[in-house]
């Protein structure tokens, strides 16, 4: 439609909407809105809409396919509405039906959407019984009888779809349809048409069957002369016969459709196959019998040619099977094999296979194939079972899986048909379950599932159940690596685990429930229990065996240990016993091992008589002691009140010791030596079974050692000891430990024999191997000179063996054997520090075991171990070879444990030795920060808690002694106090804590713990001050390390050393006073650490200080008596240091430092003061700013307290403090604290300090800022500095800037340096100046100068470079230009500081809310910002106002424009409210301000004139009516004159005039308002549409004000209100918030003038108190309806006025106009609709539909047209 054509009806509007949708078809939002609008119109005027759509399609024959589809979809949506069906005109519907059929016939094969839209129209109408006959008639018109050419494909599909949605509507026409179809089908040649006809015939058949179901009475007729037809495969439904009505026609159709199976198109073949299947349920039974061969032989081959049509073919076959299997009449047997072969591949798909993505059709086809087998099984179950068993023998996994799954499905789904096939199934599955049948894991898992199904149906009890058992047992374990490599297949670990779990569960189920379980499983399972491959499933086998024995015992039968045990494959009793004991290894470690041990222990107890008749008693200990112990150790969580959770490593050690004790008891009760040797031999043979299981092998070696200790045959012992060495993999740590502990166990009974054999083993290193790793030859060979890795690990095992042999040595011979034999032998190895790490670790462990063995508490007496220092030297040599930061082994941990054990031996270490060993340990351990991965998991293997701890060995000592030894260093924040107030720290155990060498800790944590124990033992052996100073000297350098872990470790060790010294000090005499030398150094370095970032360091530092002061008190001769004057540790922590793991708050830091400074001042001797200060100065540069600040505070307290004694050092002290300022500038608090000490000195040189600071560059550095702050806080300096500054600043403002030539005739104002400097200083000194009274006296002058500064420099800039030749230092730096942006920003900063100083927070808040601080920097907005500031002072600080105004009086007549401007700003700001000092009204001040503004109305400056008009407008808010009455006329005249200001080119004065008038009209009497009203209304009307949103907002506001004053009695204003109401409503949703708000206010204030109650109610509800509506669209909808109903004579005026805005430049206004138009014209009565100028309005809306700028405009126009549905 052309843009210039006139639109006058709804029909034209609908046509325009359709044109819009087709024009903007790619804009989904527009298209969707048009569709929604058409839907709305269609729900009210469906006939008009349908007529419009009909005409549109007819008038636009060349419209594109997608566009025509949209129109048809619109029709479909309209007629699909149930509410409008009754309104539809039948003639129009007939036209639409004909249109749809014509459109359908016009489509091509590619026009899918167009054709489907046409079909949707017809189907939608056909769903209704009113129109279904018309639709089918219309369709049949396109399908005349006798036609040899098929109708359009979508005509056929439409009939099919109608049959699906309304079968009862179509079936009455079916005879006619089929009569036309039958002669036509043979002429259908194209594949798409054949597909359509096949689909339609399927739908026809389904419709007939559905009608039979819904109307069974109509289906009571029987077939005449033929068998009845079933409707299901089960044959249980009643026979129905109304299909007979169509039997002849369907047979004719069947003949034609069947020929389509031979089509070349795969989809046609699939559709034809499904259709043939459906027709099989419709044709006569005799015909089906005749065509069985034809159907089978033609449908089966279709699978080979199908692509995606398999599902349709399978459905067709399924329907055929339903018809053929209902009884025995159909001769299907000859073809069953072919049918199954065709269906079976479809059943072989695995929907659970995640490696293959199956389509939805494939999954449906799979289910349909299963259904086919299910249907066929109702008649041919035995044939199907044979078939499936045969398929299971196929080599392809998919074939096997398919057969297994189908068989399982039949067992579960068609059980009644499979009952008599039990023996057939059992025998048929033997080959599948046989061992030689190697299949994949997926197939095996499917077989297991089939076995479960067989067990559920009691098939396993029958003959052949042993094959099932063998299969399950065989698949308990996966293939070996060799087998997998031979098959060249990737091992599916997850699949193997699932298979094992399924097999184990199936075996247990059989053992627990099967009647013949004992016959099947006993002793068959014993063949596998000792097989290496079955090691992972020993627990499952034991469970089954134990269950069998329990069932036999419960049944009162004895186990048969004879029958079947002659089988060589069945394991013997010794082998089983050894195997079961090895299963106890690491039982508490996890649930799997616990379950294995529990089952093995239960089996040992159950079959104990089989092992030996005398073992039944000891075997009972399993349930009495060991099983409860296992339950206890398996518990991982302890309750809150219970003992701490035991370490996992200690649990395993306890468990192993208990098991070995049980083994020893079991062996001891057997008197026969041969039985013991047989058991040991069986253990030796099983060592090779655990090549890959080091933990089990290590435990078996220990078991073998315990067993050999009970054997007296020496040669047997020697042979098996050698076997232990040869079988152990010495490169594995756990096996080394197991071998060494096993040898130690043997040594308890054969000490001499073991020592001799160990020497023989040591000679292996010097012999050439002839075979294997440790083979050796008899002939003489030279000694090897090159290292061998196997020999290295053997050497490590040998060293460990000697350690455990020493521990096993009897106490009466240990010293002699050690000195004469063992040490002499080991010294050759110990002396070589260059050996490999593994050997050094073993030697350190051996040293520790030796020291433990000869500890005085163990052997008694005062025997001295002379080789102690020698061994310590070896340990130091080993440590020195390590890298401090990198932890790669357990060598350091073992060295600490060795040191802790050796230092306990007599005699005590010398000071030199202490320093030497302490330095080496500390240097190698404290810096550790990285460790090699994997060390953590070896922790409990390396350290066997049962015997490796020095302290656990001496458990017989006193409890107090044990507690002292076991107290670890502090690692958590738990705090308590002892009897003397001494801090005692304990580690949180169990929950979140890491104890000792637990495997939950890292090796690094365990190493630190052992390091602490080593230092503790050093102090305990030599508890003197000298020892403490040596150790502290080593630790002090680590207090200030940057690395957290080094500080933590250093203070931890310090606390540990001081605590242990306090407990054991021997150089303290009661009554003898002496200095505690480490006191000053510790206090100087640890006191600042009280506010370390780490809470742990803080608490430990305080603990160290407490211990230090306690020790100093002891050294005064008081002994260990309580020092009543010493601070309470817990009280100090609670008061100052309680902050959790985060850093302390600033106030708490100061309080803590002040408190500790007072303590130090009281307790530090003057003789140690110099050392203390030196330490403090070192701490000033600590890496942590909080710590350096604390040091500075301590320095301040020290200077203040003892300054009189430091006169000679005062100058040096101050100099150092000033020098430190640059070094500590990063720490503000440190600067502050250092400057605090500087203030006392600065008082005497105040003038010099000021002069120097004036010359510092701007912006001031942190140091200079802090200096000014310190100076201003001094009460003597503050007032003098202020007076000096104000004088200098006032003089500098006479010439605040210079004009600089920028080139090209352009100059720029550049601010001078002096005013900036003085303002910057002023900003600093007013921050914290004292006293405040001095500041308040000078406050008016300061504010005046700052406001003057802003006015003077508002349009200036900073100098970019310094003047040439200037010798003054550079003050205005680039940093200042970046920080302050503009010079006025410096005054803003000063004002902020001043307000903060005077606690005028509300003034700051007022400025923040108005964003006035930012406006101060803008040359156009600074006046408003100052106004906000002055008015805030009036409200918050009235006492400042009068002095400020008085100070400004001298500026009023100044020649300087900035001074006059400042005076006018103050005067204008005080018009609204002028107050005296007490906050009351000050009329005198107000009059002065008004006069000042009146006098300035003629000022040459435009901004001053503008400000005067604005200020006089504020007179409306004045509280004095007298003053208002005196000056309001003058103010109004001034505002009116401002409307015509000739210099006002940008309407700035005009805007202020309108705003002033807006305020003043409230104060003007009616006569005066009436006199100016015509002029104001004339002036204001154009302002509504000005581009300036500020002017629009002011105009709307003034209009509202005028109306509220004179509108009630002025008909003239009422007329203007109706004229302007449209503008108010449209701009209520203006682009700018200010305009929207003013419109809302005006509408709210003027609603009474409309004299419409409904309008008033609506406005008061939606625009309450002048607020904007919550939803503009909803408000316009309601209000427009009210306007139309209230003022029907003006509705056309409103509509035309609104249409004028259709061409507005604002897209939002155009949207609003469209919306308002739609709402105004919605729901009008017929007479009112007749008054509307339709052509203008409708044409404008249509133009908006084509808006090219904004899509929202088109959407709004579309929505508006939807509301015009009544304009038809």
From Swiss-Prot:
Q: Where in the cell is it found?
A: Lysosome membrane
GO cellular-component term (any)? cytoplasm
Parts of the chain that traverse the membrane: none
Does the record's keyword annotation contain Membrane?
Answer: yes
Q: Where are the HEAT repeats?
A: 4-47, 164-203, 816-856, 1166-1204, 1483-1521, 1731-1768
Q: Which UniProt keywords apply?
A: Lysosome, Membrane, Repeat
One of the GO BP terms on file: lysosome fission
Q: What is its main location?
A: membrane
Statement: the UniProt record of this protein carries the keyword Glycoprotein:
no
Q: What does the record note on quaternary structure?
A: Homooligomer; homooligomerizes at lysosome scission sites.
Family stated for the protein in its record? Belongs to the MROH1 family.
Name of the protein in its database record = Maestro heat-like repeat-containing protein family member 1 homolog
Question: What is the gene name?
Answer: hpo-27
